[in-house]
Amino acid sequence: MDERLVSTEADNHESAIEQSLRPQTLSQYIGQQKVKDNLSVFIEAARMRQETLDHVLLYGPPGLGKTTLASIIANEMNVQLRTTSGPAIERPGDLAAILTSLEPGDVLFIDEIHRLQRSIEEVLYPAMEDFCLDIVIGKGDTARSVRLDLPPFTLVGATTRVGLLTAPLRDRFGVHARLEYYEQRDLAHIVSRTAELFEIGIDLRSAEEIARRSRGTPRVANRLLRRVRDFAQVLGNHSITEDIAEDALERLQVDKLGLDHIDHKLLLSMIEKFRGGPVGLDTISATIGEESHTIEDVYEPYLLQIGFLQRTPRGRVVTREAYEHFQMEVPIRD
């Protein structure tokens, strides 16, 4: 798969950059107003009762700030944040070691929690409900179960695929918060804030131009800003102007709607070779040289979101809106 500027996933280098940009409090966090308002109430109530915050499940598309919110929750509760991920916990003993090392009130953040194995999930159930850990000592006839008390803690789970969580695990979270794609004005505010942290000037129109092409995702907005900053600095500018932003984004092949060269390749292949569809997923895969699951999981979601692609029982279909975006005549379908 080609490297994409508009990918919503982060690599290791980018994760380190994101950490340096993260807001530390709910008041600094831009966007997701309903989620922020509710979390603010739950956090304040827990502090007033001098209790741990109820377990929190954050879900939604990647790149929207779930990890940042977990860090903010810990900061607002004035406790330590412990971070791990579903794939990193390979055995029940790995999770037991993490749980027994927690201090009272700590926030344990598990990213990609939907990827936990079932046997590991079962260790979490008593830990989440009763703050205890059931372990088996010995084998065979001599085996016996021992219950260890755990300090009260808050589990924050994050997932991009909430439907893959088992019902018993999902139901043990007292707070469920879905993160939505960002409004353009909030993304422009994020771009301006990041530019200030990068110590480079940017005007409102330039911030809005970057925001417009960011697919509603802060991670994409910050990545595009970094690349536009490169163009500005090489040109000898200490500030990003609208002309520089537009020129840089066009050279980076990110169009006005945030579509990149791979999106264009997929849509134009369907239009030019199959009259816009319907086309089967395997056929599209063979035509553009990408794996079917990559098309389905990586490329299609945004095209579906903006209404450029439809899934039908007979296959994928390019919509009128996509034809109009490419300034092409819409075919008359049978």
From Swiss-Prot:
Gene3D superfamilies in the record, alphabetically? Answer: 1.10.8.60, P-loop containing nucleotide triphosphate hydrolases (3.40.50.300), Winged helix-like DNA-binding domain superfamily/Winged helix DNA-binding domain (1.10.10.10)
Pfam family membership, one: RuvB_N
Single GO molecular function: four-way junction helicase activity
Which Enzyme Commission number(s) are listed?
3.6.4.-
**Where in the sequence is the signal peptide annotated?**
none
* Binding of DNA, residues: 311, 316
Q: Which InterPro entries match?
A: AAA+_ATPase, AAA_lid_4, DNA_helicase_Holl-junc_RuvB, P-loop_NTPase, RuvB-like_N, RuvB_C, WH-like_DNA-bd_sf, WH_DNA-bd_sf
Main localization is cytoplasm
Per UniProt, the keywords (alphabetical) are: ATP-binding, Cytoplasm, DNA damage, DNA recombination, DNA repair, DNA-binding, Hydrolase, Nucleotide-binding
Head domain (RuvB-H) as annotated region, ranges: 256-334
Family of this protein? Belongs to the RuvB family.
Enumerate the HAMAP family for this protein: DNA_HJ_migration_RuvB
Q: Say what the protein does.
A: The RuvA-RuvB-RuvC complex processes Holliday junction (HJ) DNA during genetic recombination and DNA repair, while the RuvA-RuvB complex plays an important role in the rescue of blocked DNA replication forks via replication fork reversal (RFR). RuvA specifically binds to HJ cruciform DNA, conferring on it an open structure. The RuvB hexamer acts as an ATP-dependent pump, pulling dsDNA into and through the RuvAB complex. RuvB forms 2 homohexamers on either side of HJ DNA bound by 1 or 2 RuvA tetramers; 4 subunits per hexamer contact DNA at a time.
- Quaternary state and partners of this protein? Homohexamer. Forms an RuvA(8)-RuvB(12)-Holliday junction (HJ) complex. HJ DNA is sandwiched between 2 RuvA tetramers; dsDNA enters through RuvA and exits via RuvB. An RuvB hexamer assembles on each DNA strand where it exits the tetramer. Each RuvB hexamer is contacted by two RuvA subunits (via domain III) on 2 adjacent RuvB subunits; this complex drives branch migration. In the full resolvosome a probable DNA-RuvA(4)-RuvB(12)-RuvC(2) complex forms which resolves the HJ.
Entry note about domains: Has 3 domains, the large (RuvB-L) and small ATPase (RuvB-S) domains and the C-terminal head (RuvB-H) domain. The head domain binds DNA, while the ATPase domains jointly bind ATP, ADP or are empty depending on the state of the subunit in the translocation cycle. During a single DNA translocation step the structure of each domain remains the same, but their relative positions change.
Protein name per its UniProtKB record: Holliday junction branch migration complex subunit RuvB
Lineage runs: Bacteria, Bacillati, Bacillota, Bacilli, Bacillales
